[in-house]
C-alpha cells in the first residue's frame, strides 16, 4: 500500500511526527538540562564539613539500610509520563547504595503540608519500602514547632524570617535564604533541641545528624547527643554553607550557640546513611514562586 493512497497511514505518520518525535526532542532537552545542572553543581564550592563519629558512645539498634524493593524495575507505576521510564532515575538512585547517603526527597508546599501533614505518611511508607530513618530537615527554629507531631522541637533566642514576608526581612540577610524558605538568626545563647518520637515509624532515632549553617565570624556551637555526650565546635569563618555531621545513633540533639554575630542558621537534618529521607518544606501561602525569589 502506498502511503499517499492510505489516509490511515498518513494519519499514523502525522501522529508519530507530532507526538513521539516531539516527546523525544523534549527528553533530549531535559537530559541536556540535567547534564548542565550537574556540571553547575560540580563547579560550586563544596560545603565545609566537620564530622563527629561517636557511634561507640551511644549504643542503639542497627540502622535500617537500603533494600531494593522486589520487582522495582518491573512494577513501576507510571504517574505523569505514562511510561515505565518515568521512575528509572529514582530506582537507579535507590539501588546505588554505595553512594553513602540516602535518596533525599523534598516536598515543597503551602499550609496544606504544615506540621508534616501528608509528608509524614509519605515518609513512613517510603521508609517501610526502601529503608532509612529520621524525620529529615527541621529548621533551627520554627513557628510551627508546637504543631508538628513528628519531632519534639524546642528552641529559644532565635529570630525567624520567612521569604514570603519580605518586608520584615533585614537587608543584610535577604540573599541568604535556603530552599526551605526560612532563615534563623541566633541571639547570644540561642538553643535548639530535637528529639525523636514514636508517633510514626522510623523517626524515633536516626543514624546521622547534620547541622546546616553559614558561620561568617567565630560562632561556637556546643552539641549534646542523647543528653549524654557533648562536644564544642568552632568552625572556621566562611561565606559558604557549612555542615557539622554527627555519625551516631541519634535520639535527641541539643545545640547551644555563643558568639553568634554573623551566623545564619538553616536547620538540622536527621537521616540514615541509606534508604530514603523525606524533607518537609512548607511555606504558608507559597504558590511555588518562592523558589524564584
Mark where each language-model region is.
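Short N-terminal or domain-adjacent regulatory/targeting segments
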Residues: 75-97, 177-198, 229-232
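Juxtamembrane proline-rich low-complexity "stalk" or linker regions positioned immediately after a signal peptide
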Residues: 2-59
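Long, contiguous interaction/targeting segments characteristic
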Residues: 38-75, 80-149
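Hydrophobic membrane-insertion alpha-helices, especially the h-region
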Residues: 1-2, 260
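Conserved SGNH/GDSL esterase-like catalytic core that processes O-acyl groups on lipids
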Residues: 104, 114-218, 223-224, 233-293
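Proteins with a high burden of low-complexity, intrinsically disordered sequence enriched in S/T/G/P/A and R
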Residues: 2-9, 34-38, 73, 87-88, ...
